[in-house]
Amino acid sequence: MKPISTIQWARLTLFVAALGMAANGPAQEAKRGSSYSPVVIKEDFATTMARMAAEKPVVMKRQMDLLNERYDLSDRPVPGVAMSRGKPVQGDVRVKLQAGTTWESLAAQTPEEIRAQGSWPAGFYPLPHPKQADGGMTFPRFVIDEIIKQEGRDLTRFDVDFDLPDLFLPEFPAGIYLTTRPDLGDVSQGKLVTLFNYYELFNGILNPKQLEGLRLLVTSFPQQQFNQTEDRRSVKPSRGVTCFDCHANGHTDATTHLVGDIRPQEHRHRIGTPTLRGVNVQRLFGSQRALKSVEDFTEFEQRAAYFDGDPVIATKKGANILERGSQVHSMAEFQALLDFPPAPKLGITGLLDPRKASKRELQGQALFMGKAQCATCHAPPYYTDNSMHNLKVERFFKPKMINGRLASADGPIKTFPLRGIKDSPPYLHDDRLLTLDDTVEFFNLVLELKLSATEKADLVAFMQAL
């Protein structure tokens, strides 16, 4: 047998290396996962539903255990403070601290010290979806019940329920205030606007184009979890969801979802549904997507967000492609009529009228514009700069897995308007902050402000007046 030459050894080495790369390539791809959801479902629907329904109690117990570990969920409304239609506003800091820790001692530490000690409050970590592994639209029970009552359309999921207590959610149904008819005040008549009553409520108040836009906003179309295929999370085939199922009465009912613009699943942020009030003064839409008009966002929602940003799945389940020049524009025109709720203590410039405001509210306003640095981003009169900012909260903690959500860097997030803020709890983009008191404590740490207890209370009082 002839000895193998140097050239032959080199060729053999390259061949073996190529085999190794071919073997490792698929393994690495499998480890990384795919951007796409499976289109062909191998399991029959009855088996899927039975399996997920059996898992549901475990899923919900894990999420509720997390909420109780993170928060004080008791009923403690703020005396004399209510939302626009009368629902009590919950007060006090609800995020729990580790034993032996105080807010003052935390505020005295640097981000590096808090990170090293692992003392970042549990309630300040990103809040996972109640079922992070699947995500998807998950509605509060009171929303589901009212839509069943009016339309017979069931938004119950057999695999998961909404998690946050009703105490900490916006009032339902919310008031509707129109920029074109401020003389009418709340035009909702205390009703949830649906396809079954929108015409009788708004005929004679809106023009025909706006009325058509509202009709489309309350018309259901297929969505990732609610559709007619075997890949759904409703017991029966579903007609889908409407824009106003989440943005109830043009406001928010706190329905949750996951952002569609991130992969893999453990990195996807929970979404707290934002209000549509005041979209006429906003120029950025989506917490991170930076869409530039409400027309863009309206079109994007049904083309992509309804289906987790997956156009392949959207084609299978029935994406509703809106026509830009008529349908999208009509929907956007109605949305642009949705005004902020009345704020009787604010003057023309969006600042407090000293003749109407309390001493505490005026002190809070001075802090908001000065020491607390709030107005750097949340500038009057609508308390937004129409921009995006990265708070870099990951300075304070090491990445960790929380119920399937990898808590790490969030990146830049849109500056949402604070006008009418008491009407739209919970707070932050993923609803991790249950009250305005929680929100002030969060930013006191993140911005390293070292505010006193009195200063923090003054800030809350000011925001309740917006």
Question: How does the language model describe each region?
Answer:
Residues 27-466:
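Periplasmic c-type cytochrome electron-transfer domains
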